[in-house]
A protein has these predicted regions:
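Active-site nucleophile and cofactor-binding loops and adjacent substrate-binding regions
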Residues: 41-49, 68-73, 101-120, 143-147, ...
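Cofactor-binding active-site loop characterized by glycine-rich and histidine/acidic residues
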Residues: 42-163, 316, 333-334, 338-339, ...
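Long, well-ordered, tryptophan-enriched scaffold segments
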Residues: 175-320
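Structural signature of the thiamine diphosphate
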Residues: 218-286, 408-413, 433-481, 601-616
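Peripheral docking tails and interdomain loops at the edges
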Residues: 299-303, 307-312, 420-422, 442, ...
Length: 616
């Protein structure tokens, strides 16, 4: 039994001495490496916050205090220390432990997290609720430095700094250049300010001046003089200008110092920011050397520190990367834009070859889309490479700054559809619905990597106006070619309609139906806006029945538009719409999620059978 195995309560954690705490931190890192190696997940960021997480759990009672994680992928250590250690073997699996904070898992997860830069907003809301309800608990927002590239963080800090709420923001700085007060004198000043005696003297001085005539005015005058000379000699941090009391930087791997600083800021009665310096991947050499690779990783060999290469197949993101790189050589007006996802979207090759035409704007999706509009207005051809779940953050800019002017901006929408282990915060299941609501928007849905390359070239070089090309995470399925016509399989009993890579399940369903004596016609739509209603109508007139399968929520889905359009054309008959419904889909392997939603081949075949038996 390891020391970590004995930590089953906060009391047990708080009882450890310094040597035991060092041993515990080493044990947590070993536990993380071994478990994430089996399940995949976010490793480097969690290795970097081991000491910080341990200190937070010792200083704060997270069953009562509110500890909010920005983004949330650095919450593994928190989960280990709050009763979920034994569930780590199920991390990111269907029905298992989520890879992000989840209130349904534990009272110590006060809020869901998954997207960046929102933690201070949520924390301020909780702090204000605490004040209004006359309750007593601490509110802490833990924000990675990357989240500080998102404008929402500054909106919240601007508001929080003007408030009088007791609020603690911890900035986990593991690589961004965020400059605090610099120089030996400034560091000495910070050291003085973090000594308890400093505050005892300050409190005593205020008490004495309050008792003498004109003492309050004297205190205010001396305080202003002190602040004036401090600013003259040492300057101020950006955070202080926003109204936060700033502490730091602090070594994020010095547990004793961290606890001291956390107890200090815990006693402040106004907004405070603690700046902590950590090393991403700390304690595991492969992750220290390649923190980006180990940020989010599949299962790997913990001894070699690498993913198994056998059976490695090119992904849709790889195809996008190769295609946009080739297009960059062909057309000098092409610019590529990403919001802090250069490697994830596959733009790293384009950035290496055409650095002056590649823009990583940080976690600023709205800015990325508006800037793309500006580039397009001046004759460039911007390609915004973005995950589906993050594009929804820029919906207003897409409407106002691109579509309203009919500008030719190409959106390469990666991770469209169900993404697997990252779960409900990351599934790309809303873009079908909101993109199709945008006037003038064209939406293409390749079903294979070959189609992705073809459609991307067409979108960039031939089409006009705003265009979205949406494609999934992962590799090709059984369908790998390029469909010349929508009809992939002729039939006479029922029409099966789908788009994108779900065609693989639909084709498999058609084979299952054939074994049951049902002849299914299969249509694959290359575009979901505009829709080829004519082809669907012609097929349904022949078969008399229709099933539409799609990896999207039901409100505003393709199936509903098809149904309305067919009815308007006088085409009737039994119809079944198979989609994700009006709900959030949990984490798990995509095949398991297909079964959950009724989108796997067997479920689709059963649904089509019911339609043919007039039981729909």
């Amino acid at each position: 039994m390891t020391l970590l195995d004995t930590i089953n309560s906060r009391e047990a954690l708080c009882a450890l001495n310094d040597a035991q705490l060092r041993q515990l931190c080493d044990g947590i890192r070993q536990f993380l490496v071994l478990n994430v190696a089996r399940t995949g997940g976010h490793l480097a960021s969690n290795l970097g916050v081991v000491e910080l997480s341990v200190a937070l759990e010792r200083v704060f009672d997270t069953s009562r205090d509110r500890l909010l994680f920005d983004v949330g992928h650095q919450s593994y250590v928190h989960k280990i220390l709050t009763g979920r250690r034994d569930e780590f073997r199920t991390l990111r699996m269907f029905g298992g432990l989520a890879g992000f904070p989840k209130p349904s898992e534990s009272v110590t997860d006060p809020f869901v997290a998954g997207h960046a830069s929102s933690s201070v907003s949520t924390a301020l809301g909780m702090a204000r609720a605490r004040t209004l309800q006359h309750e007593d608990y601490h509110v802490v927002a833990l924000m990675g430095d990357g989240a500080m590239t998102g404008g929402l963080a500054y909106e919240a800090m601007n508001d929080a700094g003007e408030s009088s709420e007791q609020l603690i923001v911890i900035l986990n700085d593991n690589g961004m250049s965020i400059t605090p007060n610099v120089g030996g004198i400034a560091q000495h000043l910070a050291l003085i300010r973090t000594r308890p005696g400093y505050y005892r003297i300050k409190k005593a001085y205020r008490a004495v001046t309050a008792k003498v005539p004109g003492g309050k005015c004297l205190y205010r005058l001396t305080h202003r003089l002190k602040e004036h000379w401090k600013r003259m000699l040492f300057g101020t941090t950006f955070f202080e200008e926003m109204g936060f009391e700033y502490y730091g930087p602090v070594d994020g791997h010095d547990l004793k110092r961290l606890e001291y600083m956390l107890r200090l800021v815990k006693d402040r009665r106004h907004p405070v920011l603690l700046h902590v310096i950590t090393q991403k991947g700390k304690g595991y050499a492969p992750a220290e050397e390649n923190p980006d690779v180990f940020h989010g990783i599949g299962h790997f060999d913990p001894e070699k520190g690498m993913e198994p290469r056998c059976g490695h197949l090119p992904t849709f993101s790889d195809t996008f990367s190769e295609t946009i790189d080739a297009l960059g050589a062909q057309e000098p007006r092409i610019c590529a834009i990403t919001a802090a996802m250069l490697r994830g979207t596959g733009l790293d090759a384009f950035a290496a070859h055409y650095p002056e035409r590649c823009f990583d704007v940080g976690i600023a999706e709205g800015h990325a889309v508006s800037m793309a509009g500006g580039l397009a207005k001046q004759g460039m051809i911007p390609v915004v490479a973005i995950y589906s779940t993050f594009l929804q953050r820029a919906y207003d800019m897409l409407l106002q700054d691109v579509a309203m002017l009919g500008l030719h901006v190409v959106f390469a929408v990666d991770r469209a559809g169900l993404v697997g282990g990252d779960g409900e915060t990351h599934h790309g299941v809303f873009d079908v619905n909101y993109l199709r609501s945008v006037p003038g928007m064209q939406v293409l849905c390749p079903a294979s990597q070959a189609e992705l390359g073809q459609m991307l070239r067409r979108a960039v070089l031939e089409m006009t106006g705003p265009v979205a090309v949406r494609y999934p995470r992962g590799c090709d399925g059984a369908f790998t070619g390029i469909a010349e016509q929508p009809c992939l399989r002729e039939g006479k009993d029922i029409t099966l309609v789908t788009y994108g890579t779900l065609i693989n399940e639909v084709l498999a369903a058609a084979k299952l139906l054939e074994a049951r004596g049902i002849s299914a016609e299969v249509l694959k739509l290359p575009s979901i806006k505009p829709l080829d209603v004519r082809t669907v109508a012609a097929s349904m007139r022949k078969t008399g029945r229709l099933l539409v399968a799609e990896e999207a929520v039901c409100i505003g889905c393709v199936g509903k538009e098809l149904l309305a359009s067919l009815r308007a054309r006088g085409v009737g008959g039994p119809v079944r719409l198979c989609n994700l419904g009006d709900r959030f889909i949990p984490h798990g392997a995509v095949p398991e999620l297909y079964r959950l939603a009724g989108l796997d081949a067997k479920s689709l075949a059963d649904a089509a059978w019911e339609v043919c038996q007039n039981e729909a």
